[in-house]
Amino acid sequence: MKLILITTITTIAAVMLVGCATTQPPSPPTAKAPEISIHKAAYQGNIEAVKRHIAAGTDVNTQDDSGWTPLHWAASKVHNKTAKLLIEEGADVNVVNKDGLAPLDYAENQIFGVLIDNGAKSGAELKAEGK
């Protein structure tokens, strides 16, 4: 009888210890964002810095004080590879800035097709749709 009681108490204690264990908070992203902002990196076509921002969890749709996203900057400076990377990582091709203009409105010929192929519309088209 003593053996059963000791076994039962030991089992209950073990269950309580396991059930009361604290869980570890999720670990932060292992990559660290570079010193340069994602907007400036996109403006400069610094694809490596953009990749590091993405790895660190930076939002590719973040807007600066003028409402420009990194894609606005990449499109305006004809940085095709940077624009493609941003789009592949979820950049919204139809975000409008404070002037009501989308990345497509700033695009040059070389990048125009990339944006159109990914559903981009001009600021005027988006305004007509009520966006």
Listing of model-derived features with the role each one plays in the protein:
Residues A21-T23:
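Bacterial signal peptide processing site
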Residues G113-K131:
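Terminal, low-structured helical/coil segments at or just beyond the last alpha-helical repeat
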Residues K40-N46, W73-H79, Y106-Q110:
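Ankyrin repeat A-helix N-terminal signature
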Residues L17-G19:
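C-terminal motif of bacterial Sec signal peptides marking the signal peptidase cleavage site
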Residues N46-I54, H79-I87, I111-D117:
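Ankyrin repeat structural motif
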